[in-house]
Amino acid sequence: MGQKINPIGLRLGINRTWDSRWYANTGEYGKLLHEDVKIREFLTEELKQAAISKIVIERPHKKCRVTIHSARPGIIIGKKGADIEKLRKKLSEMTNADTSLNIVEVRKPEVDATLIAQTIAQQLERRVAFRRAMKRAVQSAMRLGAEGIRINCSGRLGGAEIARMEWYREGRVPLHTLRADIDYGTAEAKTAYGICGVKVWVFKGEILEHDPMASERRAVEGDNQGSSSNRRRENA
């Protein structure tokens, strides 16, 4: 089962939580769900160069709070915050609600599954050899603290006549273990030969406590520890 199902969906409520965090009446649920899809599509298209990992949408009473996790927050914010204010106004028009926009920096994009998949897809579009792109991503992730990583590339790889799937793995990726903190991401590479799919699984260690927010909290704490250790090295 763990080999087939989305590893994030399998762990929801155990050590992962939802990216849309709100409740609604039966009549409003469909409308708000469509709004969430449109918001994500709009931001993904508008901020292609911002390396977006995920978009979290919360809806307190008659308000909307959008949090963008990005490896390049400067591109979203713009000069003196001008770009982020334009985005906020557009989102307010889309939702007809008072919308706030927050940016969270992803300090280690090399161990973020979605960003790894996007990077490999971009390299495939630039005609970089798929094996080289996969191995480079695996080495970077393992060097920066991942306990295991698996990458699948499928399609007409290298312009081959027959589509196939190639994969590369290093370390442990225990998909059946529910306490395992596994990040999962996908991307598509639109090449001259057709679309190639990229899937990435990153194993970041085990979470023993039963806490849906544990994975998110752990990522933030890891970023803070990394930045404080870097400051200590600079002071030394």
UniProtKB/Swiss-Prot annotation:
Annotated stretches, region: Disordered: 214-236
InterPro entries assigned to the protein according to its UniProt record, in alphabetical order: KH_dom, KH_dom-like_a/b, KH_dom_type_2, KH_sf_prok-type, Ribosomal_S3_C_sf, Ribosomal_uS3_bac-typ, Ribosomal_uS3_C, Ribosomal_uS3_CS
Disulphide-bonded residues: none
Domain KH type-2 per the UniProt entry, residue ranges: 39-107
SUPFAM superfamilies noted in UniProt: Prokaryotic type KH domain (KH-domain type II), Ribosomal protein S3 C-terminal domain
SMART domains: KH
BP terms from Gene Ontology: translation
Binding partners and assembly: Part of the 30S ribosomal subunit. Forms a tight complex with proteins S10 and S14.
UniProt xrefs under NCBIfam families: rpsC_bact
HAMAP family (UniProt xref): Ribosomal_uS3_B
Family to which this protein belongs: Belongs to the universal ribosomal protein uS3 family.
Record protein name field: Small ribosomal subunit protein uS3
Source organism (scientific name): Brucella suis (strain ATCC 23445 / NCTC 10510)
Annotated gene: rpsC
